Amino acid sequence: MQLKRVAEAKLPTPWGDFLMVGFEELATGHDHVALVYGDISGHTPVLARVHSECLTGDALFSLRCDCGFQLEAALTQIAEEGRGILLYHRQEGRNIGLLNKIRAYALQDQGYDTVEANHQLGFAADERDFTLCADMFKLLGVNEVRLLTNNPKKVEILTEAGINIVERVPLIVGRNPNNEHYLDTKAEKMGHLLNK
């Protein structure tokens, strides 16, 4: 186990009341959060979203990505389902950090795509560690999920880490003229399933 469960509190939202559960990485002290809606106990697979932190999309309403749209759509679907989990994975900018993300944006403004920009900065296309999310699911007592994602790599890593993904639920929202090239690059170079 790479992290521990450290705190929880009620979080009222426009979608209803969630239980906010805080986790801390044992090696680094970095924190992550789960939003739990309804009763997730039992043997029925839980609708879940692993949402990687995106300050620009989630809080600043950037149209450069689909992150904020995905966050809102996931919370809506979880609330409509009556139960579910959103893991807020605190690895900003596919885990290159906010300042490097801004640098990557500047490179994208010069014509690089999102993958090329990461490479220019010395990073892989995706630096995230989804095994942390498997540990969060386990600490919440959940082993079977219906995962809201377009990223088959996320499904693969969580499965390898012991989470039974019984269904991949597409989450295709937020395409606009400002992020079309970004989304096309994610599909072409990172294997994201954006047409299904």
Curated annotation (Swiss-Prot):
Tell me the cofactors it needs.
Answer: Zn(2+)
Example of a GO biological process term: riboflavin biosynthetic process
* Function comment: Catalyzes the conversion of GTP to 2,5-diamino-6-ribosylamino-4(3H)-pyrimidinone 5'-phosphate (DARP), formate and pyrophosphate.
Q: Which reaction does it catalyse?
A: GTP + 4 H2O = 2,5-diamino-6-hydroxy-4-(5-phosphoribosylamino)-pyrimidine + formate + 2 phosphate + 3 H(+)
Task: Tell me the PANTHER family matching this sequence.
Answer: 3,4-DIHYDROXY-2-BUTANONE 4-PHOSPHATE SYNTHASE, GTP CYCLOHYDROLASE II-RELATED
Residues where Zn(2+) binds = 54, 65, 67
- Per the Swiss-Prot or TrEMBL record, the active site comprises 126, 128
Q: Has keyword Mitochondrion?
A: no
According to the UniProt record, activity depends on pH as follows: Optimum pH is 8.5.
Q: How is the cofactor bound?
A: Binds 1 zinc ion per subunit.
Originating gene: ribA
Q: Which GO terms describe its molecular function?
A: GTP binding; GTP cyclohydrolase II activity; magnesium ion binding; protein homodimerization activity; zinc ion binding
What protein does this entry describe? GTP cyclohydrolase-2
Q: Which UniProt keywords apply?
A: GTP-binding, Hydrolase, Metal-binding, Nucleotide-binding, Riboflavin biosynthesis, Zinc
This entry's Enzyme Commission designation comes to 3.5.4.25
Family note: Belongs to the GTP cyclohydrolase II family.
Q: How is its activity regulated?
A: Competitively inhibited by pyrophosphate.
Please tell me what else the database record remarks about this protein. Answer: Catalyzes the formation of GMP as minor product, with concomitant release of pyrophosphate. Release of pyrophosphate requires magnesium ions.
The keyword Zinc is annotated on this UniProt entry: yes
Instruction: Record the organism.
Output: Escherichia coli (strain K12)
* Assembly, per entry: Homodimer.
